[in-house]
Curated annotation (Swiss-Prot):
Name this polypeptide is given: U-box domain-containing protein 57
Pathway noted in the entry: Protein modification; protein ubiquitination
The entry's keywords: Coiled coil, Transferase, Ubl conjugation pathway
PROSITE patterns xref list: PROTEIN_KINASE_DOM, PROTEIN_KINASE_TYR, U_BOX
Native source organism of the sequence: Oryza sativa subsp. japonica (Rice)
Catalytic activity field: S-ubiquitinyl-[E2 ubiquitin-conjugating enzyme]-L-cysteine + [acceptor protein]-L-lysine = [E2 ubiquitin-conjugating enzyme]-L-cysteine + N(6)-ubiquitinyl-[acceptor protein]-L-lysine
An example Gene Ontology biological process: protein ubiquitination
Domain text: The protein kinase domain is predicted to be catalytically inactive.
Coiled coil regions, renumbered to chain: 86-142
Broad EC category: transferase
One Pfam family here: USP7_ICP0_bdg
Superkingdom classification of source: Eukaryota
Gene: PUB57
Cited function: Possesses E3 ubiquitin-protein ligase in vitro. May be involved in cell death signaling.
Domain Protein kinase: 159-409
């Protein structure tokens, strides 16, 4: 190895390298010799060279294909160009990699978009399939039977007067028997009324709406389930010396009516207004569960400037604003509900009832108006009902509360199970031993074996509510409102009461079987 500098001149060379300046006269340049730095990989940069470092070069014969360098400057330029070329080549390689990666990313993005589109399409097809299955299930579960004229005549003994249980503007109603099953048969007062009621009842199913069984087009008759405890009006005034309703049953009935109205009003775009909510249009089943009827047909009777049939009975429950607007809205039903609440609380006739309750609240004498035949009303709950009832009966719609956000949030907690000490009041005030309504699943309408509380606050039989969820339905069976979640919480307290109740019914073999199943 030979050096291009003598030791005595090394420091001056280093200094000249650091300032990128060379004294050409100090180097004996031989054109036929190729000087190559031993540190060919540029391990050290110029800034890292300090005084005292030795820079070594190796003299080797130039290959024939390597051009001669006429000067040191041209040699250094070649080294610089070579380094620049390598950097440019690396940049080019990186740019090619970037282009490749971008192409791959674009490909993946297209594939993702196709996958999302395919997913959306499959989800749409799945939702349609679920909807069709639910519709088919509903059709199979709620089959509307067609009866002949002969069936109707046999069921009512040719519409015998003794079979008649009601006569209203909606038609004559009869107690009948079809295939050993008790039914309620209504002969519509007009063909138009018959067609409208059939159309409505085919669409609306709810635990607190009377169950529609079938029709007889020949005589414009509708067939419903039989509800043995008559209508709410008869129960309030104790017709035929019937037992008065307990305060607990009255509270439950208020909650059930409110729940049914929420269901009818739930679809804002196609909300169905009852329009004739009165105690006579609320029926009571064997378990003191209430069911509304004759809804959505008031437009056939109520026309502005005309006198509707049975005006005296309708007037106390009729929205005052209807007299000026001729229009019924969901707030019209809220007004009617308020009057019914006050009637159940006091047992008094509806006319001017709101004024009497308001006066009693103002003089702190509400306890004097409360119906004593209902048992010992919890005073705080009674006062809450009085206040919400008065609020509902505001003379103008602007003054009435919203059914969901202001009425239901007050009533719903009152419908919960009372303290254990007051549990006997689940029965009627006369000691009627019918099954308490709280024990009945609102879906299956049977005594619950495994009661579960859903996120809507209602208690259902576990199997029934899970089947409801399995159908892809995420709305409340009671209010038709969206459920916050599909979680279920065991109602162990209620299950304990049901178990105790069934034990008391042990002499009855049917209840013994029910008990063994729980």
């Amino acid at each position: 190895m030979q050096t291009g500098f003598s030791n005595s001149r090394m420091n001056s060379f280093i200094s000249s390298v650091l300032v990128l300046h060379f004294n050409k006269q100090e180097i004996k340049f031989e054109p036929s010799v190729w000087c190559e730095a031993i540190d060919i990989h540029n391990t050290f940069s110029a800034g890292e060279i300090i005084t005292g470092d030795i820079i070594c070069f190796q003299k080797i014969l130039k290959p024939p294909d390597i051009p001669k360098y006429p000067s040191v400057a041209s040699f250094l330029q070649h080294v610089c160009d070579r380094k620049t070329y390598e950097e440019v080549r690396k940049v080019h390689i990186l740019e090619e990699e970037i282009v490749t990666l971008k192409h791959q990313a674009d490909t993946y993005l297209v594939q993702k978009e196709k996958a999302v589109t395919a997913y959306d399409q499959l989800k749409h097809e799945r939702d349609n399939a679920v909807q069709q299955v639910n519709e088919l299930r509903d059709q199979s579960t709620h089959i509307i039977l067609d009866f002949s004229r002969k069936d109707m005549e046999q069921a009512t003994e040719h519409f015998k007067n003794a079979r008649e249980v009601g006569d209203t503007e909606y038609g004559h109603t009869y107690k009948g028997m079809i295939h050993n099953m008790k039914v309620l048969i209504k002969l519509s007062s007009s063909q138009k009324l018959f067609q409208q009621e059939v159309s409505i009842l085919r669409q609306w199913r709810h635990p607190n709406i009377i169950t529609f069984i079938g029709v007889c087009s020949e005589v414009s008759a509708l067939v419903y389930e039989w509800l043995p405890n008559g209508n709410l009006e008869d129960r309030i005034i104790c017709t035929n010396n019937s037992a008065p309703l307990s305060w607990y049953n009255r509270t439950q009935i208020i909650g059930e009516i409110c729940c049914a109205l929420l269901f009818l009003h739930s679809n804002k775009s196609t909300a169905l207004v009852h329009g004739d909510l009165r105690p006579c249009n609320i029926l009571i089943d064997a378990n003191y569960r209430s069911k509304i009827c004759n809804f959505g047909m008031s437009n056939l009777f109520l026309q502005l400037g005309t006198f509707p049939p049975n005006l005296t009975a309708r007037l106390p429950y009729m929205d005052p604003e209807f007299n000026t607007t001729g229009e019924l809205t969901t707030l019209s039903d809220v007004y009617s509900l308020g009057v019914i609440i006050l009637r159940l609380l006091t047992g008094m006739p509806p006319l001017t009832l709101s004024e009497k309750v308001a006066e009693a609240l103002g003089s702190d004498s509400l306890h004097l108006l409360i119906d004593k035949s209902a048992g010992d009303w919890p005073y705080i709950e009674a006062k809450q009902l009085a206040l919400i009832g008065l609020s509902c009966t505001g003379m103008t719609r602007k003054k009435r509360p919203d059914l969901l956000n202001e009425v239901w949030i007050v009533i719903e907690p009152l419908t919960r199970k009372p303290p254990a000490a007051t549990w006997p009041y689940l029965q009627s005030a006369s000691g009627d031993s019918s099954v308490p309504a709280a024990f009945i699943c609102p879906i299956s309408m049977e005594i619950m074996k495994d009661p579960q509380v859903a996120s809507d606050g209602f208690t259902y039989e576990a199997e029934a509510i899970r089947c409801w969820f399995d159908r892809g339905i995420s709305r409340s069976p009671m209010t038709n409102l969206a459920l916050p979640n599909l979680n279920l919480v065991p109602n162990r307290v209620l299950r304990s009461f049901i178990h105790g109740y069934l034990q008391q019914q042990q002499p009855n073999p049917a209840y013994q079987q029910q008990l063994s199943e729980t």
